[in-house]
């Protein structure tokens, strides 16, 4: 007899039969409980299975020893736990690891960044990106599609499984996740939010909401919607002290200018506990483009009403880019100006640049299926959030 379940991507029920299996990595806990209810099982069974999936990175129902054999057999008929596979691994001299992960016939990239007191995983949300930020390698690849929930949380699952199996090498377990990989997360809310819910869920990866960070270039209506959906730490890709410069290097600014963007940020902070009252400002340092002391004074004036800390990011080069990295002396002068205004200012340490895993260098393998007119539409207006 066929069963029906609602998938995260659609409100249309999918008929389960011998040819169709639900990937349980696509379901958050609420959806998992509904799925088990449709199987005639009690909701706590969903919690048990989620614990196996995420606490132990188990993808084999037969290994779930506290699940009865009848249910295990039923699950094998209608469901699967299928994370995307790693097809290439590169290791940096500084300990950073970059994985190329297959999503269908393409690849996205995921980066593991170990530090003394933490290990951060940088996760992708889309195959490519449509926003065309001029200093970012991903943006030069074009845009293909949004990642599914299973392809987003599957990056965390796969990395946790690899790191967990390598504990003897001293690799630190994942403590933080940043949605700063390939893509604009707010153009994929339908899948990004359930994936982050699994990251936060005690039966998922159980991360603190202060340890899950979403970074956005400024899709303002989607940012307003995010605040009603989930509470996570927020970082914003600002990169300029005025609209003239930002219009050039971050084209979405032509639709949602800095004032509009920062207004949405402040509205988000009013709803959020994860941010402890302030947002992280990301500012890539481009030589003689946005890195002068006059730009630092402008930035300080711009941000005086926005509680924040500022991350200055030395630009990481990629082939064909028209920019240069700011010198250490220019970055130092810029930082000192900001600190003189009382801003907490950090110069981000470049990690993984020898394997093209540093900020702005992720490229993956993207078949660009977004015509330029559609890219301009994505930059200039918000796509129906229900459709992304």
UniProtKB/Swiss-Prot annotation:
Keywords: 4Fe-4S, Cytoplasm, Disulfide bond, Iron, Iron-sulfur, Metal-binding, Methyltransferase, rRNA processing, S-adenosyl-L-methionine, Transferase, tRNA processing. One of its GO terms (molecular function) is tRNA binding. Its cofactor is [4Fe-4S] cluster. It is found in: Cytoplasm. One of its GO terms (cellular component) is cytoplasm. Its main location: cytoplasm. InterPro entries: Aldolase_TIM (IPR013785), Methyltransferase_A (IPR040072), RlmN_N (IPR048641), RNA_MTrfase_RlmN (IPR027492), rRNA_lsu_MTrfase_RlmN/Cfr (IPR004383), rSAM (IPR007197). One of its GO terms (biological process) is rRNA base methylation. Coiled coil: none annotated. The active site is at 109 (proton acceptor), 359 (s-methylcysteine intermediate). [4Fe-4S] cluster binds at residues 129, 133, 136. Disulfide bonds join 122-359. CDD domains: Radical_SAM. Residues 115-354 form the Radical SAM core domain. Binds 1 [4Fe-4S] cluster. The cluster is coordinated with 3 cysteines and an exchangeable S-adenosyl-L-methionine. Its EC number is 2.1.1.192. Gene3D superfamilies: 1.10.150.530, Aldolase class I. Pfam families: Radical_SAM (PF04055), RlmN_N (PF21016). It catalyses: adenosine(2503) in 23S rRNA + 2 reduced [2Fe-2S]-[ferredoxin] + 2 S-adenosyl-L-methionine = 2-methyladenosine(2503) in 23S rRNA + 5'-deoxyadenosine + L-methionine + 2 oxidized [2Fe-2S]-[ferredoxin] + S-adenosyl-L-homocysteine; adenosine(37) in tRNA + 2 reduced [2Fe-2S]-[ferredoxin] + 2 S-adenosyl-L-methionine = 2-methyladenosine(37) in tRNA + 5'-deoxyadenosine + L-methionine + 2 oxidized [2Fe-2S]-[ferredoxin] + S-adenosyl-L-homocysteine. Specifically methylates position 2 of adenine 2503 in 23S rRNA and position 2 of adenine 37 in tRNAs. m2A2503 modification seems to play a crucial role in the proofreading step occurring at the peptidyl transferase center and thus would serve to optimize ribosomal fidelity. Belongs to the radical SAM superfamily. RlmN family. This is Dual-specificity RNA methyltransferase RlmN. The lineage of its organism: Bacteria, Pseudomonadati, Pseudomonadota, Gammaproteobacteria, Enterobacterales. The gene is rlmN.
């Amino acid at each position: 007899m066929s069963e029906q379940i609602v998938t995260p991507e659609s409100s249309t029920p999918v008929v389960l039969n011998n040819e169709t299996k639900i990937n349980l990595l696509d379901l958050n806990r609420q959806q998992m409980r509904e799925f088990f209810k449709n199987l005639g099982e009690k909701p706590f069974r969903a919690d048990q299975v989620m614990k196996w999936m995420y606490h132990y990175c188990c993808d084999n129902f037969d290994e779930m020893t506290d699940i009865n054999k009848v249910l295990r057999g039923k699950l094998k008929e209608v469901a699967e736990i299928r994370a995307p596979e790693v097809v290439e691994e590169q290791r940096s001299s500084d300990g950073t690891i970059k994985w190329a992960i297959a999503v269908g016939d393409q690849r996205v990239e995921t980066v593991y960044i170990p530090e003394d007191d933490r290990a951060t995983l940088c996760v992708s949300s889309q195959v490519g990106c449509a926003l065309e930020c001029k200093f970012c390698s991903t943006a030069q690849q074009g845009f293909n599609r949004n990642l599914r929930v299973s392809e987003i949380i599957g990056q965390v699952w796969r990395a946790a499984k690899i790191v967990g199996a390598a504990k003897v090498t001293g690799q630190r377990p994942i403590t933080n996740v940043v949605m700063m990989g390939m893509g604009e997360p707010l153009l994929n809310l339908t899948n990004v939010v359930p994936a982050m819910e699994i990251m936060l869920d005690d039966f998922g990866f159980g991360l603190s909401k202060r340890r899950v960070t979403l970074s956005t270039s400024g899709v303002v209506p989607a940012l307003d919607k995010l605040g009603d959906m989930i509470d996570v730490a927020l970082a914003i890709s600002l990169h300029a002290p005025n609209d003239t410069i930002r219009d050039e290097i971050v084209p979405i600014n032509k639709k949602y200018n800095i004032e509009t963007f920062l207004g949405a940020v402040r509205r988000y902070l009013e709803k959020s506990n994860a941010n402890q009252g302030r947002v992280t400002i990301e500012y890539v340092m481009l030589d003689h483009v946005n890195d002068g002391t006059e730009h630092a004074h402008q930035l300080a004036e711009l941000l005086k009403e926005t509680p924040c800390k500022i991350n200055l990011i030395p630009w990481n080069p990629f082939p064909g880019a028209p920019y240069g990295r700011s010198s250490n002396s220019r970055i130092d002068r810029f930082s000192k100006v900001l600190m003189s205004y009382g801003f907490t200012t950090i110069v981000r340490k470049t990690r993984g640049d020898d394997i093209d895993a540093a900020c702005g260098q992720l490229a993956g393998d993207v078949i660009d299926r977004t015509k330029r007119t559609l890219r301009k539409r994505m930059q200039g207006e918000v796509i129906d959030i229900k459709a992304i």
